[in-house]
């Protein structure tokens, strides 16, 4: 326990909370343009071809973001909405692209967890 004179000399330091998605600049989402759409492989115990896109955001940042779901229609120059959220087995991927918004279509024939993949409610037979 420090004395009062020690606290006068050197006050307590307030810990700064670092953002996990700094490129969004405290916004819930940001719009951006795809500069490159490609696949990459995950870290050690896992094996796959994960779909990712390099996106230039409206604030000038260039980020790598993940395209969730099965199949997508993204190309270079597609306009997308980027949200926070990292992908644990892809180093450097700290953002997700929102499905069913702007140029990216929702997942086709998705029945469960539809809101996360921008899929409309299926028509009843």
Curated annotation (Swiss-Prot):
Domain of life: Bacteria
Metal-binding found in the keyword field: no
Pfam families: Ribosom_S12_S23 (PF00164)
Signal peptide start-end: none
Keywords, comma-separated and alphabetical: Methylation, Ribonucleoprotein, Ribosomal protein, RNA-binding, rRNA-binding, tRNA-binding
Quaternary organization: Part of the 30S ribosomal subunit. Contacts proteins S8 and S17. May interact with IF1 in the 30S initiation complex.
HAMAP family, per database record: Ribosomal_uS12_B (MF_00403_B)
Name used for this protein in its record: Small ribosomal subunit protein uS12
Organism: Bordetella petrii (strain ATCC BAA-461 / DSM 12804 / CCUG 43448)
